[in-house]
Amino acid sequence: RTITPRIKDMLPDFSEDAIADSFFENVSDITIVACGTAMYAGMVGKTMIQNRLHIPVTVAIASEFRYEEPVINEKSMVIVVSQSGETIDTLEALRLANKYTKKTLSIVNVKGSSIARESSYVLYTHAGPEIAVASTKAYTVQVASFYLLACKLAMTQQKISVEEARTFVG
């Protein structure tokens, strides 16, 4: 449920998430904020996005980000990742990011969570409850979400063609 509903005509499509294409335009840099396993998914996401867009992408530990003066502006996109959507450090980092940019996107599993409510847009991963200590299910769907985001961003910013995007998704 993470990937299939977000692919139309072999292209990434976030219309079911109510995310307009304009959200992906004019992005100067991206900061990914998370804790724990979600941060490791963010590191993979950084590589995917940076390799496609050739713009600065940083990964920040939420517990540190919230105490720093963030280097973000209105053209910055901040992607916040949390399995539960309630991680307090990540939520506080999101609140700080919202003071600087309207381009905040959360990747969360739990519908209606605090992080989802306070983000400009949200991608629900639909992973279901995580039973094990090792968060493999959540990690996998977070990485899949980054894969689609990297493709959508690159296509919207004309870094790859529609045909390249289809190859990327296919």
Identify the function of each model-found stretch:
Residues 25-168:
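Glycine-rich phosphate-binding loops that contact phosphosugars or nucleotide phosphates
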Residues 1-9:
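Flexible catalytic loop/linker elements that gate and position reactive groups at enzyme active sites
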Residues 4, 16-17, 87, 91:
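Short, well-ordered alpha-helical scaffold segments within catalytic/effector domains
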